[in-house]
């Protein structure tokens, strides 16, 4: 399972509830994108969330 290289964000699991309080398992997936960034001066392909890209915590190569 992929996770954000910078923040460690990954898929979360829980339940969805109906009005009758029935439940079934579901997952919330992070919006991960595979991008090339500089790691120790060398380009590397890593999974990064869209929020991390928008915030400017990493820059593409």
Curated annotation (Swiss-Prot):
SUPFAM superfamilies: L28p-like (SSF143800)
GO cellular-component term (any): ribosome
Gene3D superfamilies attached to this UniProt entry: Ribosomal protein L28/L24 (2.30.170.40)
The keyword Ribonucleoprotein is assigned to this record: yes
Example of a GO biological process term: translation
Region Disordered, residue ranges: 1-26
UniProt keyword Translocase present: no
Any one GO molecular-function label of the UniProt entry: structural constituent of ribosome
InterPro entries hit by this protein: Bacterial_rp_bL28, Ribosomal_bL28, Ribosomal_bL28/bL31-like_sf, Ribosomal_bL28_bact-type, Ribosomal_bL28_sf
Keywords: Ribonucleoprotein, Ribosomal protein
Pfam families recorded: Ribosomal_L28
Family, similarity comment: Belongs to the bacterial ribosomal protein bL28 family.
PANTHER family: 50S RIBOSOMAL PROTEIN L28, LARGE RIBOSOMAL SUBUNIT PROTEIN BL28A
Matches recorded under HAMAP family: Ribosomal_bL28
Name of this chain's protein: Large ribosomal subunit protein bL28
Source organism of this protein record: Lactiplantibacillus plantarum (strain ATCC BAA-793 / NCIMB 8826 / WCFS1) (Lactobacillus plantarum)
Gene: rpmB
